Amino acid sequence: MLRQIIDSFDSAILAFLTHGALHTATYGHAVSHVADFYLFKGVLPLAMLCAIWFDTRERRQWQWQRQMVVATVLSGVLALFIGRVLAHYLPFRQRPLYDSSLHLTFPIAATPEAVLRTWSSFPSDHAMLWSAVAMGIFLVSRWMGVIALLQCAFLICLPRVYLGLHYPSDVLAGIILGAGVTCVVTRKPIMERFAPVIVRFIDRYPNVSYAGLFVILFELATTFDEPRELAQSIFRHVLHG
């Protein structure tokens, strides 16, 4: 019964997007670029985290804000990892782009076809990652958090549904799971176990710390695409010789 409700919901949303006035070649081309550009995915929310980190207007809350930034970054990494583990071990769900039973036509996505065909659609790891980051921002700054959540919804999640990369339920589940990860990691008893130590280390060794943080934020913004591709290349070379 639940599966039928979800399928009906997904089909209705996809039909609306693909048969509506927005389904044009020009709009599809623009959305494809928005979905593929890292600027619209990770750079904006991570820039907000940097702004929070260096915001010294409230000195009494400064250390807490920096601890929250650390916890948010960790939440994002953890959410991305959990999302890809779930996609690997849960029953495979074909992406709507390749489901001929839907009888829908989607714009061509920029992501390589081989990657799309072999990765399960559920849950959306992009939705998990960036909803986790957006929730962390929201817990520190309401107005910045609202912007981050809207950016996650309209510049990350909605384009991926429009392009047929995910079903609406994929991104909704990803948003809920990602935000949930942040809510757990940022709980005071949990955050106090690791965040203050990391902040003190950064304060004590700023040069090496900020260099390392730059690399971490870069990889997070690009969803660790290059390390993943390198690992897959090495694995294929070792496996096939």
Residue ranges, per PLM feature:
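N-terminal transmembrane-helix/juxtamembrane module of multi-pass inner/ER membrane proteins
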Residues: 1-46, 83-113, 225-241
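Multi-pass membrane proteins that catalyze or facilitate reactions on polyprenyl-/lipid-phosphate substrates
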Residues: 2, 65, 69, 73, ...
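Divalent metal-coordination and catalytic microenvironments
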Residues: 34, 126, 170
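Membrane-interfacial alpha-helical segments at the cytosolic side of multi-pass membrane proteins
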Residues: 43-52, 127-143, 176-188
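Membrane-interface loops
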Residues: 63-139, 143-151, 228-235
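Aromatic-anchored segments of alpha-helical transmembrane domains
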Residues: 76-81, 153-164, 218-223
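Transmembrane alpha-helical segments of multi-pass membrane transport proteins and ion-pumping complexes
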Residues: 76-88, 175, 179-186, 222
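Interfacial helix-loop-helix junctions of multi-pass membrane proteins
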Residues: 89-98, 155-181, 229-236
